[in-house]
Amino acid sequence: MSAETATSPAPAAETPVAPAPATQTTPAEGAPTPAAAAPGGNTVSASLYVGELDPSVTEAMLFEIFNMIGPVASIRVCRDAVTRRSLGYAYVNYLNAADGERALEHLNYSLIKGQSCRIMWSQRDPALRKTGQGNIFIKNLDQSIDNKALHDTFAAFGDILSCKVGTDENGKSRGFAFVHYSTGEAADAAIKAVNGMLLNDKKVYVGHHVGKKERLSKVEELRAQFTNVYIKNVDLEVTDAEFEDLVKPFGPTISVALSRDEKGVSKGFGFVNYENHESARKAVDELNEKEVNGKKLYAGRAQTKSEREAELKKSHEEKRLENEAKSAGVNLYVKNLDDEWDDDRLRAEFEAFGTITSSKVMRDDSGVSRGFGFVCYSSPDEATKAVSEMNGKMIGTKPLYVALAQRKDVRRQALESQIAQRAQQRMQYGAGFPGMQGYMGQPMYGYPPMPGYGQPMPGMPPVRGPMMGYPGAPQNMMQSRPRFNPNGQPLPGGVPAYGMPPQVPYPGAPGYPVRPGGARIPAAPNANGPRNGGPSPVGAPQGLPAGSIPRGGQMPARPHEQAAPAPQAGRLDAQSLARAAPAEQKQMLGEALYPLIHETQPELAGKITGMLLEMDNAELLHLVESQPALQEKVDEALRVLAEWGKDEKPAADEGAEEPKKEEEETKEEEKKE
């Protein structure tokens, strides 16, 4: 392998820079983050796991760092399958294991975009990763101890495969850590030497790591043999002596405490610790729901705060899932309601389709209707019938939009999935040229191009020069699609694509020279025309002399021909939309929405229009008529685009260099010719 190949920058995708040897072990695509690379693998591996990465780190950034150690075979940043966001870890494959060892020695805990990375050998075998051999657990750590300080402290006892300090979402230490040694003997030596020592003036606990399943089973055993009892709803007039007399008949106690505040007033609850589990169980059975001084007591096993919070969270989640299961398929979302609609009017319009359990029109803080509401039926069949009958129905001045209600996070996830699918389609069919926005460099509304998209029609000359009125514009820029009547005159609706200037008429149109057989007549040589096969002047299609084109790049108008009017916003109504063919309705809605969106988002108008056209036609018509509703949808689309673009922008910029390079090579070839 040449040195030039080894030092070339890595592409954004997982394209190997050089072929890897047969002995190399590469991590599986989308493999989960290993807790630690377990020892015992016999295969010589040159694959490193790099964790704790900033979400914006790309393959190219990692290549620049790791290629300084030695030739890199491939790099992959693992990403979410739907959103394509970085999962915070990557795999770096070297051509030989010696380079991997040097990278592990010199780059471990180094800063990448201001964040310390964690490097260890990749272990593909999950059985070896999860054995836990040589893995120790440390708790009661000082907040100032990080991964590097932990590694330096425990490296004296043996070869460390991985060490990690547990952190919260803000990156602060949670006071515990894990260290994984290559051998069990090293782990035993570390436990013997460090357990009970002071680290930064705090006494730490060090022991063998116990798996979560084993810990939970042990906790359940301890809970089943509880001796500490919690009693609440105790009358505030009950004294300590009366409380002891209440709990002592069930067995010998270790401690009895009735909680009081700083003023000595009872808080209404207390704790009793019995000597054995049988006494505690008997106290719970006898005292729970027993009436004392007119109050029913609650008695149960004493729980820690974290345990109570976990149970409370679990109960809330179960209740939420139960409510969702009850409303699945029966709860409808109704939009485009007139301002005067109330709950009774909403129920009256929908009660013909079945039994309504609840109906509500949503209002703001001042009591003004927000234009939407919810209707819940007793069965899914009734809800389905209401959707089929009421969706798109004109009641008052607006067509209703009726659909099954969805939670906000579900709608957001569906929208992100649509954006990810469009991104994959652009990658599959070829993205637009750099700098082109919306429709200029993409097929209509973000859909994949049809076969032959961007190619000339049969009998049409290939366009080598830029389009008229757009010097230097790319050749695949979307052209207008005017509609013609049988006499060949353009209809009023046949406007160019969203404000683009009229294009040169197709070959074969009146005034275009053709042979009797229908073929185009080649143009005669012209002194002002291109020479030696060079490109035509700006705005001149091949086959026409440049002198026949007036200044400004405009074709002369034919007799009785009138220019097509510019698209006007807000001219579309429900009646005209209903008269149009289904295939043309989306086009009409797009032509009406684009200028409205272009007023506030000129650069992203094309993308946002394509996103909104996924919606129902009735809802799109409402967006055309209601500027506040349209602005709300535009803002939502901008938020989704901003979040999705955080991870995709660096990769897109790198991928955009290839079309630029090809364009430069094409220009060089034309100069040589």
UniProtKB/Swiss-Prot annotation:
A Pfam cross-reference name: RRM_1
Segments forming domain PABC: 569-646
Record carries keyword Ribosomal protein: no
SMART domains (alphabetical): PolyA, RRM
Any single biological process term in GO: mRNA processing
Function (record text): Binds the poly(A) tail of mRNA. Appears to be an important mediator of the multiple roles of the poly(A) tail in mRNA biogenesis, stability and translation. In the nucleus, involved in both mRNA cleavage and polyadenylation. Is also required for efficient mRNA export to the cytoplasm. Acts in concert with a poly(A)-specific nuclease (PAN) to affect poly(A) tail shortening, which may occur concomitantly with either nucleocytoplasmic mRNA transport or translational initiation.
Protein's name in the database: Polyadenylate-binding protein, cytoplasmic and nuclear
Organism name: Cryptococcus neoformans var. neoformans serotype D (strain JEC21 / ATCC MYA-565)
